[in-house]
Swiss-Prot record:
The gene is Trmt10a. It is found in: Nucleus; Nucleus, Nucleolus. Residues 88-278 form the SAM-dependent MTase TRM10-type domain. Residues 43-83 form a coiled coil. Belongs to the class IV-like SAM-binding methyltransferase superfamily. TRM10 family. It comes from Mus musculus. This is tRNA methyltransferase 10 homolog A. One of its GO terms (biological process) is magnesium ion homeostasis. Residues 1-91, 281-328 are annotated as: Disordered. Its EC number is 2.1.1.221. GO terms for molecular function: tRNA (guanosine(9)-N1)-methyltransferase activity; tRNA binding. Residues 52-62, 305-319 have a biased composition (Basic and acidic residues). It is an enzyme of class 2 (transferase).
Amino acid sequence: MSSEMLPASIESPNVEEKLGTSDGEEERQEPRVDAGAEPISKRQLKKLMKQKQWEEQREQRKEKRKEKRKRKKLERRQLESNSDGNDRKRVRRDVARSSLRLVIDCSFDDLMVLKDIKKLHKQIQRCYAENRRASHPVQFYLTSHGGQLKKNMDENDQGWVNWKDIHIKSEHYSELIKKEDLVYLTSDSPNVLKDLDESKAYVIGGLVDHSHHKGLTFKQATSYGIEHAQLPLADFVKMNSRKVLAVNHVFEIILEFLETRDWQEAFFTILPQRKGAVPAHKACESSPQDHQSLPEGWDSASEGESCRDNPDSPQKDEQGQQSSPVLQ
């Protein structure tokens, strides 16, 4: 009788579950995403565990950024309370201006639809605002300004004509800055930027939705015979999403680096949390095949993604719809 019951008991789901976790084989158990999914390897499981740990620390990182903003705000108030009445000018005089030139190249105007032009406009607004409040503001250039971008700014942001501490030019950057001073920031460059030379002018491609024009900024840099480089993102960060940085991502990372002289701190202060960024030294080791499966290199162009919590009020487009916070 017992021999007849034995096959039925072996086929029981409960017994199968116990067998799968017995004899020290817990580590060999292969979790599945769903009933029809492929089994997950131990290495992939380890990566998922690392990511889970990173996600669990999300609030802690968010609080740290909030505390940093509060501390800076308190420092400004203390400066103002100790001033002689000319508070704002007093604070601005304490800023250590950088001689580094940061250029947004707007020569891709005819390659973008109006929706992307509006995104670029918002990113430029963010760059301007961040540079105005930075401890080490850069010499900000907006070149090849015209076409759809200028028209959109005229219609939706007429105050841009009164912007201060910015050079808005219709000329191409190659007509304004010496060739030997230029460095184009592009993900396709084989050169990795290790430090910033404040005598140089770093160019950011003002191109939204660059996936339709892959390698365009690199081709432009080589055609003009100027230096090119990419930020050392891969040395400090591993991301589980597309490695695409918006214009103001790049701009703000450079501002942060000028203040901290720490690339990793700059990346993790600026990069949006939803990109799943993890410090490179904390990410588990992966095989060359894993690297090949990662998304292709980041670029200074964007798809209108937003970064850290934006303290500024959201902008509205022509239809009166609230847009995402600006970044890049």
